[in-house]
Amino acid sequence: PLLVKTERVTVIPGNHDRYVYQQHGTDLFTKYFGDFFGTNELHVSKINQEWVLVGWDSAHPNDWRTAAGTVKSSTIRATEKLIDSFSDQTNFIVVNHFPLTFPEDWKFDRFHELYNLVPVRNWILQNPQIRLYLHGHIHLNWCHRLPRDSAPELLLVNSAASCSKLHTGQSSSFHQIVLEDSNVKVNPILLN
């Protein structure tokens, strides 16, 4: 294991972990990182009294020309059930490999994104207890905000390029997320 206290680490599989079926049915992500996600539909980690982290596995083997994923309907149902099991004051962070928003000049490629992106994004927006959506996949960093009617906005944070050289228009090397009571603040951190 990478750390002795696996409950302090969450590892979410991405398309590179599940591009193609492995020989002999071996799931290498589960073999090497399974302790950090678990065997259930969701990875759940209670951060504190106000915040719960929910990890989704939307990566699956595809045809060699695609890098897309799918959030299963069973994952959505399990998340609904989880949210319902907590008080209305509890805030949730969903962690998933694939983004739900993109930079303005991004050229969308349906073979590289979530197949069910729009219904998943709409479902999340209809659940105001989900306050933060963390993802990767696109090797650029950004923080987007989606407004909600009569509810706190949804913050969507991509820190997928934490180790790479900054691209034009990027303002952060990675993001620091501060959770105070029911408030969330995202600070861009720039390394020179």
Predicted regions and their residues:
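Structural motif
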Residues: 53-55, 93-95, 134
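Short acidic, glycine-rich surface-loop motifs adjacent to enzyme active sites
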Residues: 83-104
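Extended active-site neighborhood of metal-dependent phosphoesterases/phosphodiesterases
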Residues: 1-81, 86, 119, 150-156, ...
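Active-site environment of divalent metal-dependent phosphoester hydrolases
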Residues: 13-23, 61-66, 99-103, 130-148, ...
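Short glycine-enriched, charge-decorated loop/helix-capping segments at active-site entrances
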Residues: 67-70, 106-112
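A short C-terminal boundary segment appended to hydrolase-like catalytic domains
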Residues: 179-192
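Short coil/turn segments at beta-strand junctions that form active-site/ligand-binding loops
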Residues: 7-8, 88-91, 129
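Conserved beta-sheet core of the metallophosphoesterase superfamily
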Residues: 109-180
